[in-house]
Design a protein with these regions (language model features):
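Active-site anion-handling motifs in enzyme catalytic cores
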Residues: 1-387
């Protein structure tokens, strides 16, 4: 198959990187092209070894299409066509070398402005290219919106990464299958690690600007992480790996992690993990005895290597993945919106940490079958390409 991937962020978000890597590992020997938002950054993390990287956007001259979109913006305030114009040349160039186009930004329907993804879906359709919404999570109330439901039905296939989204999309009448997030399929890559991983138990911690942005009580998320670190230092002998998973300039996990590191006077039990590729981060996380994470794909790196994990989440993806892995999300996901008192994350940690051996055994038993479900999506894509 000739597969084009689009709608994804660049690899400085290592979740975006992990989706591409996991997709290639799942689907195997095909021709891959990525319509990249930042070819240089994607190449920096090695994605050019897996796929041809093509700029997703091109500067548009002021042709009729530009003038029409500009008029629509000025008259109606609708900027979707104006934004979408810059993607059209790359999409039109895909016609001769694409069997399937995968929209791989799994969170794209979580953050508003879904109209641009409907625009891109239609743009591929005009080139007679079948589209697949790949590894997605969408809040059921968003799926229920008529415009979203209509858009979802225009995909040849929707591959939902958890059951909450699957049921909502199925009810909307779209062609849908349920698969694990493609990042579950990405293999870790061994790398050099801090020597403290060899000398002591290590608990991994990830915090993100995103959960701080989504908190309802200002300062609650950071205060809870700070209290958790203090608890671990007072009540265990474990070292703590402060682990970034997104390093974009405007959304950089290293900023709150470095603040935590400094707030504890760079205590020798704290490991400030540097930036790595997604497979290397997965390897580092796999060496933790327990993981507390905010970034979805940091927690997937933990889950998929059998590491007991507490998720500080804010959306359907965290709830749905935990429900599919454990049968429920309560106790496994702490919604950041609910944080009020500074000890809530610590209490949730204590509850899971006490059960860590049983959780690890459960993950090790069920993960092979869970990940194997992804094979259904591979077969579905092959059938679409042949149809």
């Amino acid at each position: 198959m000739k597969i084009t991937m689009y709608g994804n962020g660049s690899a400085g978000n290592h979740g975006c990187e992990a989706i591409i890597r996991g997709t290639v590992q799942l689907l195997g020997a095909n021709e891959y092209c990525v319509l990249s938002e930042n070819c240089g950054e994607d190449a920096q993390y090695g994605l050019n070894a897996l796929a041809e990287l093509v700029p997703a956007k091109e500067t548009r001259k002021k042709d009729f299409g530009f003038l029409r979109a500009y008029a629509k913006l000025k008259l109606t305030g609708n900027y979707t066509d104006m934004d979408g114009l810059y993607y059209l040349p790359a999409i039109q160039n895909c016609k001769k070398n694409t069997d399937i186009a995968l929209s791989i930004g799994g969170d794209n329907y979580c953050y508003g402005n879904t109209a641009i993804y409907a625009y891109l879906n239609r743009a591929f359709g005009k080139q007679s290219i079948k589209t697949v919404l790949w590894g997605c999570s969408i809040e059921p109330d968003v799926v229920a919106e008529p415009s979203t439901s209509e858009d979802l039905r225009h995909y040849a296939l929707v591959a939902a990464r958890e059951s909450i989204t699957y049921e909502a999309v199925k009810a909307a009448g779209a062609n849908v299958v349920q698969i694990p997030d493609p990042a579950f399929c990405m293999q870790p890559k061994e790398c050099a690690m801090d020597e403290r991983f060899l000398k002591s138990e290590v608990i991994g911690i990830n915090i993100s600007p995103m959960i701080i942005h989504n908190e309802r009580n200002a300062g609650a998320a950071y205060a809870n992480y700070k209290a958790l670190i203090q608890y671990i230092m007072d009540n265990t002998d474990a070292s703590i790996a402060l682990t970034p998973h997104v390093v974009w300039a405007n959304n950089d996990d290293r900023i709150p992690l470095k603040q935590l590191y400094d707030d504890f006077d760079q205590n020798p039990r704290l490991i400030l993990v540097e930036d790595h590729t997604a497979p290397e981060l997965k390897y580092i996380i796999s060496k933790c005895s327990f993981f507390v994470g905010a970034r979805t794909h940091a927690t997937i790196a933990a889950y998929s290597t059998g590491v007991p994990t507490l998720v500080v989440g804010y959306s359907v993806k965290a709830r749905g993945i935990a429900r599919d892995l454990f049968g429920l999300e309560d106790g496994y996901v702490l919604p950041v919106q609910q944080l009020k008192e500074s000890n809530e994350l610590t209490q949730a940690f204590i509850g899971l940490y006490e059960k860590r051996d049983a959780i690890r055994a459960h993950l090790n038993e069920m993960l092979p079958g869970y990940i194997a479900r992804a094979d259904a999506a591979r077969k579905a894509l092959e059938e679409l390409a042949e149809a």
